[in-house]
């Protein structure tokens, strides 16, 4: 039986019921719906709707239902209820009879689902923070293990300047720390309790909403009933945070896919995160990384979906908002598995130091050092840039590195070049000079790594 049947003289069509019912999606809110109902039973007891004995009976029945459904979610789906709220109420009535019909007094499914969803976001959000923390740890451990491996840094996917592999790892640590901070901020803003605001105008029962919020673990109650039941900002914000984080995951995956390619050969991925070809026996494909990259678009789609759903809704609640959960659930599931998989990939990754060093020594990645050398000799940088460009063209034509050009040939481009030029053209010199804060010199990378190890980031809200 629908919770709203009294107004209607005929049954809903089977097609409408299939179209309207949300239980196949929102069954995942069972724990939150029951927890919220337990808190609501206590709240309406305090304003005289229920006796203490009735409240005790409802609490017992709700806890029993929670135990039953936590191990058998199929029980929920098989009920054929309209939504998770209807399932809980119908189950409660089956257990305690007419007493179960009193629980919804003063409450609407509008404030009920808003409460359920925020409780779910808080719980799942905390789990995502922990997964982000584990990925951060995996990157730090990889940076520590391969801190001084030399590799080419790229711009436009062209070799640019040499960097340390540890520096590359710590670049992604910075990104994922920002993701942690963003999610923490979103969860703080979501830490307000909607329960007790009714359908849109507030509840007619003079309950203590501050106490009600505290009983559910919220920092405070919401302050405007119209906004409360209309609000899905927390869904939008979490999907946005997930999209940014997935973008970071996808960029890291793309880097690693390239590093793993035969053309680069910088790293070797562990067998447990790769797969083969059904036709080509030699293939070892980076499927884990490619799926991370692929799932990023899926998460973006859910963000656009909820933004588009909400963009023109009048106050207060509209049925359109039922579409909030499917995308959110998929976002959180996709984000979680990608974080776990990325950490697993990193844990088994091996760096081919000979190959990375060889690549860093090619592509004239020391050209900037020659320009800086000329600047130190008194030449304006723009002129030095031009001189070095000419020298590089000459070296390319002769298929030789800059450091292998004879001194006389280098001096043909600028008379201020002396024999000490070769000292600045080594890989070691290129790296050592990047000693300003945030640079890729070994002391700077070691200092940055030590800071990440000594000061663990907070992973709660």
UniProtKB/Swiss-Prot annotation:
Family annotation (Gene3D superfamilies): Fumarase/aspartase (C-terminal domain) (1.10.40.30), Fumarase/aspartase (Central domain) (1.20.200.10), Fumarase/aspartase (N-terminal domain) (1.10.275.10)
Cellular location(s): Cytoplasm
Chief location category: cytoplasm
Pathway: Amino-acid biosynthesis; L-arginine biosynthesis; L-arginine from L-ornithine and carbamoyl phosphate: step 3/3
Top EC class, one word: lyase
InterPro entries, per the entry: Arg_succ_lyase_C (IPR029419), Argininosuccinate_lyase (IPR009049), Fumarase/histidase_N (IPR024083), Fumarate_lyase_CS (IPR020557), Fumarate_lyase_fam (IPR000362), Fumarate_lyase_N (IPR022761), L-Aspartase-like (IPR008948)
Catalytic activity: 2-(N(omega)-L-arginino)succinate = fumarate + L-arginine
Coiled-coil intervals: none
Entry EC number(s): 4.3.2.1
GO cellular component: cytosol
Molecular function per GO: argininosuccinate lyase activity
GO biological process, one term: L-arginine biosynthetic process
Pfam families tied to this protein: ASL_C2 (PF14698), Lyase_1 (PF00206)
Domain of life of the organism encoding this protein: Bacteria
Family (UniProt): Belongs to the lyase 1 family. Argininosuccinate lyase subfamily.
Protein name, entry field: Argininosuccinate lyase
Organism: Shewanella piezotolerans (strain WP3 / JCM 13877)
Highest classification ranks of the organism: Bacteria, Pseudomonadati, Pseudomonadota, Gammaproteobacteria, Alteromonadales
């Amino acid at each position: 039986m629908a919770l709203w049947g009294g107004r209607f003289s005929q049954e809903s069509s089977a097609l409408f019921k299939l179209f309207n019912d949300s239980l196949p999606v929102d069954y995942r809110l069972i724990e939150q719906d029951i927890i919220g109902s337990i808190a609501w039973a206590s709240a309406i007891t305090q304003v005289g709707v229920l006796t203490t004995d009735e409240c005790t009976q409802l609490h017992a029945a709700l806890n029993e239902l929670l135990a039953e459904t936590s191990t058998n979610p199929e029980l929920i789906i098989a009920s054929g209820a309209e939504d998770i709220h209807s399932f809980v109420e119908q189950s409660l009535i089956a257990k305690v009879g007419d007493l179960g019909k009193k629980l919804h007094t003063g409450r609407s499914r509008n404030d009920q689902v808003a409460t359920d969803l925020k409780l779910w976001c808080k719980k799942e959000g905390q789990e995502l923070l922990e997964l982000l923390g584990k990925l951060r740890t995996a990157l730090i451990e990889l940076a520590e293990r391969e801190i001084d491996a030399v590799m080419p840094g790229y711009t436009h996917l062209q070799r640019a300047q040499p960097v340390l592999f540890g520096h590359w790892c710590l670049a992604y640590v910075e990104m994922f720390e920002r993701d942690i901070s963003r999610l923490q901020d979103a969860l703080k803003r979501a830490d307000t309790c909607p329960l007790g605001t009714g359908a849109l105008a507030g509840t007619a029962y003079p309950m203590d909403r501050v106490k009600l919020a505290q009983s559910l673990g919220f920092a405070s109650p919401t302050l405007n009933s119209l906004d409360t039941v209309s609000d899905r900002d927390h869904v939008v914000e979490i999907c946005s945070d997930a999209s940014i984080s997935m973008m970071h995951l996808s960029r890291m995956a793309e880097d690693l896919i390239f590093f793993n390619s035969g053309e680069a050969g910088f790293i070797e991925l562990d067998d447990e995160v790769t797969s083969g070809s059904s036709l080509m026996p030699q293939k070892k494909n980076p499927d884990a990384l490619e799926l991370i990259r692929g799932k990023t678009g899926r998460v973006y789609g859910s963000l656009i979906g909820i933004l588009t759903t909400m963009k023109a809704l009048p106050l207060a609640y509209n049925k359109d908002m039922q579409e909030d959960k499917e995308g959110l659930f998929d976002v959180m599931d996709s984000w979680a598995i990608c974080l776990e998989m990325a950490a697993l990939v990193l844990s088994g990754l091996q760096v081919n130091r000979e190959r990375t060093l060889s690549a860093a020594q090619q592509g004239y990645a020391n050209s900037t050092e020659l320009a800086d050398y000329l600047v130190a000799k008194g030449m304006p940088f723009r002129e030095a840039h031009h001189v070095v460009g000419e020298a590089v063209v000459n070296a390319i034509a002769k298929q030789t590195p800059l450091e292998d050009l004879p001194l006389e040939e280098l001096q043909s481009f600028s008379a201020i070049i002396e024999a000490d030029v070769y000292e600045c053209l080594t890989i070691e010199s290129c790296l050592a000079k990047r000693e300003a804060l945030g640079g890729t010199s070994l002391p700077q990378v070691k200092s940055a790594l030590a800071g990440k190890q000594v000061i663990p980031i907070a992973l709660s809200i």
